């Protein structure tokens, strides 16, 4: 019975993660972070994460996706995903590596740096975002594993960018003020 509950919770979370859009990445981490990450509640942090999405996602993964054009599990097996509206579009681009996972893991690394007191919860949530891609049939496990490496490399590279460093410091300062 407990196993069924775990499977149900995992499937429900995976379906929710499949619908990330707009501020969805920031919203997905609000619970793990311990406070809302919205443009209203944490404008500097929200801006930092919004700016990172393209770097960690499409820009970081597009080349490999185009080169390998690995078929996605749902297309390979002919089954539905957690969000059938995306299936047609996703079946036309490569599975390897997972852009969503790269974004999720990069976000987790940066948030854990800003709020180290909650790093376990944050990193767990980042890990779960990737696993959701496997549960929903969008990606193979190796797509997700590779994407975590990509996300880590993106964060390391972003730390050499003065604009990123400046925005990161603003987000850290904003977070510190909110903690007082």
Enumerate the predicted regions with their spans.
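Hydrophobic alpha-helical bundle signature of multipass membrane enzymes
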Residues: 1-135, 160, 167
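C-terminal membrane module of polytopic membrane proteins
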Residues: 154-180
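Interfacial helix-loop-helix junctions of multi-pass membrane proteins
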Residues: 128-159, 166
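Short alpha-helical linear motifs
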Residues: 69-74, 144-152, 172-175
């Amino acid at each position: 019975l407990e196993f069924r509950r775990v499977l149900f919770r995992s499937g429900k979370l995976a379906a929710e993660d499949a619908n990330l859009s707009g501020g969805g990445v920031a919203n997905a981490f609000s619970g793990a972070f311990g406070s809302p990450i919205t443009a209203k509640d944490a404008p500097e942090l929200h801006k930092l994460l919004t700016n990172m999405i393209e770097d960690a996602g499409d820009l970081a993964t597009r080349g490999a996706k185009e080169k390998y054009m690995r078929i996605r599990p749902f297309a390979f097996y002919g089954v539905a995903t957690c969000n059938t509206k995306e299936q047609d579009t996703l079946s036309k681009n490569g599975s390897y590596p997972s852009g969503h996972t790269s974004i999720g893991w990069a976000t987790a690394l940066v948030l854990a740096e800003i709020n180290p007191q909650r790093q376990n919860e944050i990193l767990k949530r980042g890990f779960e975002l990737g696993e959701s891609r496997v549960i929903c049939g969008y990606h193979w496990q190796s797509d997700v594993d590779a994407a975590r490496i990509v996300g880590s490399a993106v964060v390391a590279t972003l730390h050499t960018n003065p604009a990123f460093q400046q925005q990161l410091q603003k987000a850290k300062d904003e977070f510190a003020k909110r903690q007082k």
